[in-house]
């Protein structure tokens, strides 16, 4: 695999590596699978992308599914909701007689749900695409679904196109934006074009002798909102940090070399907000009123641009960003690039975004 670290795919064998203990789960495919239960909506997106949504016979949390085709099949009684790992419908799962149930684990501890399924004779295969750090690493799981369904060639060609698109966008941006400068975009810049910016300190000149020739600086991004009293900042090597970096930004407070998020207080986030040009993914909030209502301290966060990945949220609360977004990181990257360009120019671009909205 080019990007995926927790997956190996052969012609008739798929090996998934558990990141918690290094154990391997193997799925051998001697013929295309005809009936699949998906415990994650991202699995549905991969099957949808290769035109195999019809093999899905069961899902976990139908209300959270974004796929229009899958929802239509659910409404028609062709797909069933099998519950959650904490409250599964074992009788329904067994009755569906799936060729495989695609699951996931969130720790090294043995899952009573998965153990029970195995004892009932249900074939289970665990996947960890949600723990891949590289956006293309998550998208590369389409190859596994291609092998499952006999559409490996299609899956390979789709992934090649996705990776090519993503890498071209990232390279164009990287060619323009590379080195740190202290000038804050969106607050102090007065031109739509930043190509004439000069190094802002002697430090810039020493660290980057070519800074005189560099154009735009990286957009400084505040991420997320607190859950309870804890605010989680993505690690510098995490999925979201890679997307933001490839789009020309940097996440404030992200720890370099780390994939895991780190916890900070709201007060610490407020200090970071003073440097921020943009605020991304503020939870469920779709307006500044929502933000102010969620935490009175947010009224003091004077960040010029706020965007959330909630454009494609279902009535049941599912978010397509975490469904089809896994298959289409190049679309997310385009959204972020458009947002960062808008931050520089001060223009509104909400209508041209696919996964994001502007929080006003």
Segments from the language model and where they lie:
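Short hairpin/turn module used for nucleic-acid contact or packing/dimerization
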Residues: 300-360
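Conserved alpha-helical elements of sugar-nucleotide-dependent glycosyltransferases
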Residues: 42-43, 236-239, 332
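A short, structured surface patch at a secondary-structure boundary
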Residues: 3, 7-96, 100-107
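Binding-cleft/active-site segments that stabilize strongly anionic ligands or cofactors
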Residues: 61-136, 140-143, 148-193, 213-326
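Bacterial Sec-exported substrate-binding components of ABC uptake systems
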Residues: 1-44, 154-183, 190-193, 210-222, ...
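Phosphate- and divalent-cation-binding pockets in alpha/beta enzyme and binding domains
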Residues: 45-46, 112, 335
């Amino acid at each position: 695999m080019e990007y995926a670290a927790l997956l190996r795919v052969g012609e008739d064998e798929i090996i998934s590596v558990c990141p918690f203990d290094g154990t391997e789960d193997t799925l051998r495919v001697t013929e295309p699978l005809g009936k699949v239960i998906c415990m994650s909506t991202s699995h549905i997106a991969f099957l949808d992308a290769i035109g195999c949504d019809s093999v899905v016979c069961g899902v976990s949390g139908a209300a959270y599914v974004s796929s229009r085709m899958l929802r239509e099949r659910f409404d028609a009684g062709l797909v069933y909701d099998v519950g959650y790992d904490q409250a599964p419908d074992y009788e329904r799962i067994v009755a569906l007689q799936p060729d495989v149930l695609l699951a996931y684990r969130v720790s090294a501890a043995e899952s009573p749900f998965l153990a029970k399924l195995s004892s009932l004779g249900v074939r289970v295969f665990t996947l960890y695409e949600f723990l891949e750090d590289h956006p293309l690493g998550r998208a590369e799981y389409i190859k596994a679904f291609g092998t499952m369904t006999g559409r490996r060639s299609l899956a390979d060609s789709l992934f090649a196109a996705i990776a090519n698109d993503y890498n071209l966008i990232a390279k164009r941006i990287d060619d323009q934006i590379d080195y740190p400068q202290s000038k804050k975009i969106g607050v102090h810049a007065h031109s739509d074009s930043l190509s004439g910016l000069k190094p802002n300190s002697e430090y810039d000149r020493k660290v980057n002798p070519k800074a005189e020739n560099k154009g735009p600086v990286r957009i400084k991004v505040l991420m997320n909102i607190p859950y309870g009293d804890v605010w989680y900042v993505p690690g510098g090597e995490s999925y979201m940090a890679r997307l933001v970096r490839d789009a020309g930004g940097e996440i404030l407070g992200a720890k370099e070399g780390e994939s895991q998020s780190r916890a900070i207080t709201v007060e610490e986030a407020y200090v970071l907000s003073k440097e921020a040009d943009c605020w991304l993914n503020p939870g469920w909030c779709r307006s500044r009123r929502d933000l102010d209502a969620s935490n009175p301290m947010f009224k003091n966060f004077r960040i010029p641009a706020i965007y959330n990945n909630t454009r494609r949220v279902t009535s049941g609360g599912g978010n397509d960003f975490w469904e089809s977004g896994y298959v289409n990181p190049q679309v997310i990257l385009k959204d972020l690039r458009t947002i960062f360009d808008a931050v520089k120019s001060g223009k509104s671009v909400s209508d041209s975004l696919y996964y994001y909205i502007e929080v006003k």
